[in-house]
């Protein structure tokens, strides 16, 4: 279990894309498009009896079991995203939107280190071994296809420039359900503040 979240640092993420808006009525419309986006974070945490598979930095081999100590994790994922959003206009300048999105992760990293703690072989009652530092890399185990919900708003500041704020909430975890090294689901949840050029 995670006993404390000692540091959480979301990275500066870049999103580039093209969107198409189709009005359906005076107020309602549909927006879709294609986005290239990256999402990332760095986390420092203290855990107890956390299932871990890692490699000892001293070259003594792989360690598997229940880890108690510090964990540092680095996440950097790049996606191609296809949103399908219903939009509602609140006057000439404001517009809100909501709907599903579908993402394909074409490049991803989930790596880090376990440090200053101990691991018990196989489970919390196993043989205890002190570990100063062990590294892990689960990048190849990341799920490629993601989907979720997006909601947000857009303000037309000028004729060709809008300011937007969006929240994306992933509905499937970043690892497959049969992945054993992380025993709970991790869902991608991100907020985006940005600008768009209106043609």
Where are these regions (language model features)?
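Short glycine/proline- and aromatic-enriched beta-strand/turn motifs that initiate or cap beta-hairpins
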Residues: 1-21, 96, 142, 170, ...
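Hydrophobic, lipid-facing positions within transmembrane beta-strands of outer-membrane proteins
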Residues: 12-18, 80-84, 147-151, 189-193
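Transmembrane beta-barrel strands of outer-membrane/channel proteins
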Residues: 34-38, 98-104, 165-169, 197
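Outer-membrane beta-barrel "beta-signal"
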Residues: 155-161, 187-199
């Amino acid at each position: 279990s995670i006993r404390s979240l000692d540091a959480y640092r979301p990275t500066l993420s870049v999103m580039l894309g093209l969107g198409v808006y189709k009005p359906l009525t005076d107020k309602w419309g549909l927006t879709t498009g294609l986005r290239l986006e990256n999402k990332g974070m760095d986390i420092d945490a203290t855990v107890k009896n956390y299932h871990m598979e890692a490699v000892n930095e001293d070259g003594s081999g792989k360690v598997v079991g229940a880890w108690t100590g510090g964990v540092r994790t680095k996440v950097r994922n790049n996606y191609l995203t296809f949103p399908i959003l219903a939009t509602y206009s609140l006057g000439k300048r404001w517009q809100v939107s909501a709907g599903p999105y579908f993402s394909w992760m074409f490049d991803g990293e989930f790596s880090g280190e376990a440090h200053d703690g101990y691991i018990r072989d196989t489970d919390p009652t196993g043989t205890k071994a002190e570990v100063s530092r062990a590294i892990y890399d689960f990048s190849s185990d990341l799920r490629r296809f993601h989907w979720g919900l997006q909601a947000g708003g857009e303000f037309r500041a000028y004729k060709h420039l809008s300011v937007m704020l969006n929240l994306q909430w992933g509905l499937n975890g970043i690892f497959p359900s049969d992945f054993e090294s992380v025993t709970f689901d991790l869902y991608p949840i991100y907020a985006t503040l940005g600008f768009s050029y209106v043609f």
